[in-house]
């Protein structure tokens, strides 16, 4: 089976290296599948995963204002990436990896987790 990795995190459709941030603040921290992302409540974020051979890409989009989570699958056809059918995406291995990873959102020190198919955040200050 082909391995995949988190290639990029996009905020509001802009790649992280293009996103204007303060130099003192860590934008994305990766250590053993733990990612720290600085995002406000109005933000939209996309996680782009890619297989090791570069033949497939998976995009998981999270919209905080709409409280929506969506999934897109792309396959390389020799000249470009083509969007594939994404039925039953909740059972795909990439989605399980996304769920197993931990994402911390700065601001109110919220940790994002998914439960019952909906995005939830837990305020660490409230317990």
UniProtKB/Swiss-Prot annotation:
The keyword Nucleotide-binding does not apply. Its main location: membrane. Induction: Only expressed during growth in minimal medium. It is a peripheral membrane protein. Keywords: Cell membrane, Membrane. GO terms for cellular component: plasma membrane. The keyword DNA repair does not apply. Interacts with both the D1 and D2 domains of dynamin-like protein DynA. This is Protein YwpG. It comes from Bacillus subtilis (strain 168). The lineage of its organism: Bacteria, Bacillati, Bacillota, Bacilli, Bacillales. The gene is ywpG.
């Amino acid at each position: 089976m082909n391995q995949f990795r988190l290639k990029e995190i996009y905020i509001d459709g802009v790649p992280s290296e293009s996103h204007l941030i303060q130099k003192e603040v860590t934008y994305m921290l990766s250590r053993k599948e733990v990612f720290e992302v600085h995002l406000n409540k109005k933000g939209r974020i996309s996680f782009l995963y890619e297989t090791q051979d570069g033949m497939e890409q998976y995009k998981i989009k999270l919209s905080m204002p709409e409280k929506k989570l969506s999934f897109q699958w792309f396959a390389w056809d020799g000249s470009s990436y083509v969007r594939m059918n994404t039925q039953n995406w909740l059972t795909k291995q990439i989605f399980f990896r996304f769920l197993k990873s931990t994402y911390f959102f700065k601001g109110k020190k919220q940790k994002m987790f998914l439960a019952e198919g909906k995005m939830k955040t837990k305020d660490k200050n409230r317990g």
